[in-house]
A protein has these predicted regions:
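Alpha-helical transmembrane segments and their helix-start/interface "positive-inside/aromatic belt" motifs
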Residues: 1-7, 71-83
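Transmembrane alpha-helical insertion/packing segments
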Residues: 1-51
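Hydrophobic alpha-helical membrane-insertion segments
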Residues: 77-100
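Juxtamembrane non-transmembrane "cap" segments at the membrane-aqueous interface
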Residues: 96-115
Length: 160
């Protein structure tokens, strides 16, 4: 069962990676693949059981225990994707100016808590929609990757 969860997580990881990469070409994946947001739900479907495999009791060395059960390449890969997710999120905030793209009164706008930050062209609107997906998918990759590696390498003694 752990291996099945791991494979499911790898499918989620590579799907998230593909979605993420598409946004660099100004593509809004949610426009072409409406179910793309299912990837957001998938991280919870996998990450919560991964926490059970790891043990739910609060631990001071939670991450050290997770990393101890995996090979060195897994630790480095997760750390690299985690660092990328932080940088990606900062870039997302910068590029979106803290706003969300929307259509209001037939106009493309960027708004923040109901306040219009500025009007957008249709092209800018499409890019802003892509930035939103990019902001989320950067985190999806980390959650799927951690789940995949933990499920694959966690010892058989783990309760699940």
């Amino acid at each position: 069962l752990r291996r099945a969860f791991s494979i499911f997580a790898l499918v989620g990881f590579f799907s998230s990676l593909l979605v993420h990469l598409s946004t660099f070409f100004g593509i809004d994946p949610s426009k072409h693949v409406p179910w793309v947001w299912v990837l957001h739900l998938g991280i919870f479907v996998l990450f919560i059981p991964m926490l059970f495999v790891q043990g739910l009791k609060p631990k001071k060395d939670f991450w050290r225990e997770i990393f101890a059960a995996m090979p060195r390449w897994g630790r480095y890969t997760i750390k690299a994707f985690f660092a990328y997710a932080i940088i990606n999120f900062a870039l997302f905030i910068f590029l979106s100016r803290g706003g969300v793209p929307d259509v209001r009164d037939g106009k493309y706008v960027l708004h923040n808590h109901g306040q219009v930050v500025r009007e957008l062209s249709e092209n800018e609107y499409e890019w802003q929609k892509a930035y939103v997906i990019r902001g989320f998918s950067g985190h999806w990759m980390v959650f799927y990757l951690v789940s995949a590696i933990v499920f694959w390498y966690r010892g058989k003694s783990a309760q699940f």
